[in-house]
């Protein structure tokens, strides 16, 4: 009985110390209380049971992290809530574990973590291990999963799921607040593959106008198209009011006044048009110097004058207008007769017709052959085919009213 109670004065901790002598981390038996060391062994065993791979990697590469584990007290029954750790340290641990799984050498790992710019050896996870130092993000947003190289779109477009229980860092990184903060600052964990380059709205490149106060409409349309294409947020946020203001200001500046010609300039231009409907460039330059006008103004005046003459011809070609309008302008036949010789009266407009058509030798008709009325019939067709100016209509109407005078021309 004495032998069985002889060990009763020893404490339970001393007995456990005696039994745990051959523990791989046990201490030699002492007279002091070693109950704290036993609790340490239990906590260490529990931690190794939950994180076998990370404990090994931390013992190899991060010795300081072992001291952090000793201060933590992990509850025995909570498998779904791992101990919270610092976000930055957690990202480094994940990167270290992935590279260790790929069988990376410790020297290469330290070189990659300390000097991310210099690439010593190609690895599929090189971008994810060095993006933190290169981007200099305020909050570490590097998330490495078990897959060696996840796609960029998966990391950028993933919808935040707060109910996921992978780890605490996932919630910190992919929370809506952090995403909005990253969108505001413009710092992304991985840049999206198709990021539109937002350019400031550029001013439209417009060519200088030919004359002051004039701007081509093509340049304005190019300016509008250029601003629409280079708008940062598309056509939805495009400032159309600004374009309308610029167009209104351009129209005010480019409003031209109608060119007014003096009576002397108009008279000289009418004289030139009477002889030549189409003028050469040399003649146009001479007229411009004589009338103190620009070459462009003279060209436009002749174009407008030809259009006006064409409209007048279309109105005067009707037989009613021809018979009523130009017969009143003809002089009487008795006034043109010669009183001294008593020769048959010859109408003056017939000779005036040959004088005015002298400038057009191709249109004039030769009367040297005496063929009578048969020779004068093609002349009427010639006048109907080539209509140059109103005098021809005048003579044509005179032929219709006085056919007996054609005999005197032969």
From Swiss-Prot:
Expressed early in development in a striped pattern at the blastoderm stage. Later expressed in a specific subset of neuronal precursor cells, neurons and glia in the developing CNS. Between 5 and 6 hours of development, found in the midline precursor-2 cells in a segmentally repeating pattern. Expression in many other neuronal precursors follows and reaches a second peak of abundance at 9 hours of development. Expressed in the hindgut between 11-15 hours of development. Residues 71-93, 138-157, 175-221 are annotated as: Disordered. It comes from the Eukaryota. Pfam families: FTZ, Homeodomain. The keyword Phosphoprotein applies. InterPro entries: Antp_homeobox, FTZ_N, HD, HD_metazoa, Homeobox_CS, Homeodomain-like_sf. Gene3D superfamilies: Homeodomain-like (1.10.10.60). Phosphorylated at as many as 16 sites. Keywords: Developmental protein, DNA-binding, Homeobox, Nucleus, Pair-rule protein, Phosphoprotein, Transcription, Transcription regulation. The keyword Hydrolase does not apply. Its main location: nucleus. Residues 254-313 bind DNA. It is found in: Nucleus. GO terms for molecular function: DNA-binding transcription activator activity, RNA polymerase II-specific; DNA-binding transcription factor activity, RNA polymerase II-specific; RNA polymerase II cis-regulatory region sequence-specific DNA binding. May play a role in determining neuronal identity, may be directly involved in specifying identity of individual neurons. Required during embryogenesis for the process of body segmentation. Homeotic protein, required in alternating segment primordia, it specifies the correct number of segments. 'Fushi tarazu' means 'segment deficient' in Japanese. Flies lacking ftz exhibit embryos with half the usual number of body segments. Belongs to the Antp homeobox family. This is Segmentation protein fushi tarazu. The gene is ftz.
